C-alpha cells in the first residue's frame, strides 16, 4: 500500500484502490462550499475538474450552482459542469453533483467576509450534515469558512460538539510528517492557562489514543505532550503548570495504558527531527501547535475532527481572501482531506 509517512494513503493510491470496487460500494462524499467569497470554490472546482475524482468517490457539493458558475468563469476553467440534484440520494456516480441549498440571489464579493457569506457557509454545512445524518452521504469534507459563520458557537469544534452533544471534539491536524492535537483551541491568550487542567489534558490524551488506534490503526500510539511555559517551566522558574497540571495528567494517562511522554519544550522538539519519533503531538494551545505544523507541512495538511460520531475533515488553511479569484490557490490540502475521508471509513 502506498502510504504517506502520516499513515494515510496518497490521493492517487486511493484512485487506484477505489477502481477495484464497484460503484455500489463507493463512498458518497459530501463537500460544503465554505465561504463563497474565499478560495473554497476554487479548491473544489480544481479538484472536481479532474475526472479521476469519480474514481475515488461519488462527489456531492452542497452550495449554489450560480456561485459555482461565477467562480468557474472567474478561474477560466472550461469543460466543467455540475449535475444539479434535489437530494444527495439522486447523485450520479459518474458525475460531480450539486445540491442547491443557498439562495441564488446571494451576492459574491470576492476577498471579503460578509454576513451574507457567513450565512451561506453555515447553510451549506447544516444541509450537508442533515444529509449525513440521514445516510444520504457517507462522509463530509468542508471548504474553508470563518469562525463568525459558526455563531453563536465560538468555533467549528464547538459547533459540532453542540450539534452532536459530545463533550470532547478536537481538531486533529494530519500531515505527511506529523499529527497535531490541542488541549485548547480558539481562546484569547489570557484565558489559556485557566483552561489547562489535569482533566482537560487527560481527556484529550484519551481521545488522541483512541482516535489513532481506531482511525489510523496505530496499535500503541506514542504521544508527545508539549509544555506550556518557556523551557517547560525550567523547574518552576518560569511557571508551575508543568509540575502541578501537565505532569500529573501525563502520569494519569500512563496509569491507564496511554503512552504519553513529556512535557517537551516546543523549541527543542521542533528544532530538528525529534518530533518524528512520535505518532502525534499534543499542544497546549492553538498557535503552539499550528505554527510548527504549518511551517513543516505547509498548507497540504488536513484536519480530522476527532471525537464525533461522523467523519468530517477539512483543510488546515483559511479562506485566503488575499488570493481569491486569482487561480493560484493550492488544492493539495483539500485533496488530502478527501484521501483521508476515503481511507478512514475502512477502520470505523
Sequence positions of predicted segments:
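N-terminal polybasic/positive-inside topogenic patches
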Residues: 6-7
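Anion-binding alpha/beta catalytic cores of soluble intermediary-metabolism enzymes, centered on
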Residues: 23-241, 247-348
Amino acid at each position: 500500500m502506498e502510504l504517506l509517512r502520516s499513515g494515510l494513503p496518497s490521493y492517487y493510491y486511493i484512485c487506484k484502490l477505489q477502481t477495484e470496487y464497484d460503484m455500489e460500494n463507493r463512498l458518497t462524499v459530501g463537500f460544503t462550499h465554505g465561504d463563497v467569497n474565499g478560495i473554497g470554490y476554487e479548491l473544489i472546482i480544481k479538484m472536481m475538474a479532474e475526472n479521476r475524482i469519480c474514481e475515488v468517490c461519488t462527489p456531492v457539493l452542497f452550495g449554489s450552482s450560480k456561485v459555482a458558475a461565477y467562480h468557474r468563469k472567474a478561474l477560466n476553467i472550461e469543460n466543467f459542469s455540475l449535475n444539479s440534484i434535489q437530494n444527495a440520494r439522486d447523485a450520479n456516480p459518474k458525475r460531480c453533483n450539486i445540491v442547491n441549498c443557498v439562495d441564488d440571489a446571494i451576492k459574491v464579493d470576492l476577498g471579503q467576509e460578509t454576513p451574507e457569506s457567513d450565512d451561506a457557509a453555515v447553510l451549506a454545512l447544516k444541509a450537508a450534515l442533515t444529509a449525513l445524518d440521514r445516510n444520504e452521504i457517507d462522509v463530509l469534507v468542508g471548504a474553508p469558512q470563518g469562525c463568525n459563520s459558526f455563531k453563536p458557537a465560538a468555533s467549528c469544534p464547538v459547533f459540532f460538539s453542540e450539534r452532536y452533544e459530545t463533550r470532547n471534539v478536537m481538531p486533529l491536524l494530519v500531515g505527511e510528517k506529523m499529527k497535531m492535537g490541542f488541549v485548547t483551541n480558539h481562546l484569547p491568550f489570557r484565558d489559556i492557562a485557566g483552561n489547562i487542567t489535569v482533566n482537560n489534558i487527560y481527556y484529550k490524551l484519551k481521545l488522541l489514543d483512541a482516535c489513532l488506534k481506531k482511525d489510523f490503526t496505530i496499535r500503541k500510539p506514542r504521544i508527545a505532550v508539549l509544555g506550556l511555559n518557556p523551557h517547560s517551566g525550567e523547574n518552576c522558574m518560569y511557571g508551575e503548570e508543568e509540575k502541578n497540571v501537565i505532569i500529573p495528567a501525563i502520569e494519569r494517562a500512563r496509569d491507564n495504558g496511554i503512552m504519553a511522554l513529556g512535557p517537551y519544550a516546543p523549541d527543542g522538539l521542533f528544532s530538528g527531527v525529534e518530533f518524528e519519533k512520535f505518532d502525534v503531538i499534543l499542544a497546549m494551545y492553538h498557535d503552539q501547535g499550528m505554527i510548527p505544523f504549518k511551517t513543516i507541512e505547509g498548507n497540504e495538511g488536513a484536519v480530522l475532527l476527532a471525537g464525533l460520531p461522523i467523519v468530517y475533515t477539512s483543510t488546515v488553511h483559511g479562506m485566503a481572501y488575499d488570493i481569491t479569484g486569482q487561480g493560484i490557490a493550492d488544492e493539495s490540502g483539500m485533496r488530502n482531506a478527501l484521501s483521508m475521508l476515503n481511507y478512514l471509513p475502512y477502520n470505523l
